[in-house]
Amino acid sequence: MREGAAGRMGRRGFLVAASACAAMAALRSPPLRAADAARYDHPWIPSDAFLADLLEWMRAFGVPGVGIAVVEEGELVWHRAFGVADVDSGTAVDADSVFECASLSKPVFAYVALQLVDAGVLQLDRTLAHYHRPDYLAKDDPRLDRITVRDVLRHSSGLPNWREHPDREPLRTLAEPGKGVNYSGEAFFWLQRVAETVTGESLDRLARRHLFEPAGMRDSTYTWNAHAARHSVTGQPAPGATPVVQTFRSQWSLLQPIAEAQGKPLPEWVWNDAVRALPRAQAAAPPGMFVWPGDLLANAAASLRGPVQDYARFIAHVMRPDAGPPRAITETTRQAMLAPQMPLRAGWLDKGLGWNLERIDGDARWFFHGGANAGRYKTFTVGDPQRRRGLVVMTNGGGGTGVYQRIVRAATGRDMLAFDL
């Protein structure tokens, strides 16, 4: 399932324009020099003086609500909510508020995929086609058969971000796999199909068993449930932007009665369930909302939603050395995930496995990832794995980029290069 965006972008548009930021640094990077350590050695909880002005910044950028969470020493230590969850009702953002994580969905799924690698269910350098070859792949593109699991996680698959017409447009590569970065939600969705094929589990069930429950992310979901229905925030377009239908919310509400009729909850749906439900969904929905089975499914690249503190628990889980199997990936896999895999900007930015990496000083790197859904939700996370420190910001406004950048600068003391690329 995909979120909508303005005009022609429709249900897939936000994914075409979604933020491509993502990052995590190696846990065993060389230590910082003393001067550099002092420069960044302070907690990432924003100051009271900054927070006193935050509502003014939110108003300036047309952002109704913000959630912030901070990790220190590998533990969630602070979270705060600001503004309103819904402009019409005036309901305040609180600890239960569920945000659309947007492309922050990708690092979470990457972590689950790496757990499957550790379990021997997947191999990083084996091709996706070895495990599962969807029928929507182009039949005249041999490069599709060379895309590996590693290529997906470091965005070197050569695939596009999203097809504009998936109901009639075969998926084909834009570039040779493994040779450069092509940010691709399609690649993550194909890997999702692979994971569902080899495990026999839906994305949401797989994530819940392998990650959400062990990490304490009890209110997170890739689909829709009663908690999300009660507590989801409502996004607001940026000032002057064309209003956009919030199709994730609209789609899930239309699919709920179909799921009940089919006798299978939405979190348990896999591809064949979506194929079966598509005719009924199309009959119940406005034209163009559901054009192929992928519009009915959870989406590893974009549909995660949850409270800001749940995502901070994920960041803490990634950096906590004592998580241990089956709660976490192995240390060897963790090092591969957080190490440079593909250069983005030589000497400064790299792709890890599911994350982007930004060099801070010497060989030390921070991790970060951004997200954008439907021109209404902007999200960002950044962390310092050497100090096991992290920051998560989620907003329900299309102008949220300007807000989260100011929060990151105020909390970390750093103006990230990624903000200018």
PLM features: what roles do these ranges have?
Residues 1-13, 17-24:
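N-terminal secretory signal peptides
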Residues 40-99, 121, 164-174:
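Short, conserved catalytic-motif segment at the N-terminal edge
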Residues 60-69, 88-151, 175-186, 299-302, ...:
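Short active-site loop at a secondary-structure junction
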Residues 86, 139-372:
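Short, surface-exposed loop or secondary-structure junction motifs
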Residues 346, 360-364, 394-421:
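Short, gly/Ser/Thr-rich active-site loops of penicillin-recognizing serine hydrolases
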Residues 369-370, 378-397:
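Short, well-ordered beta-strand elements
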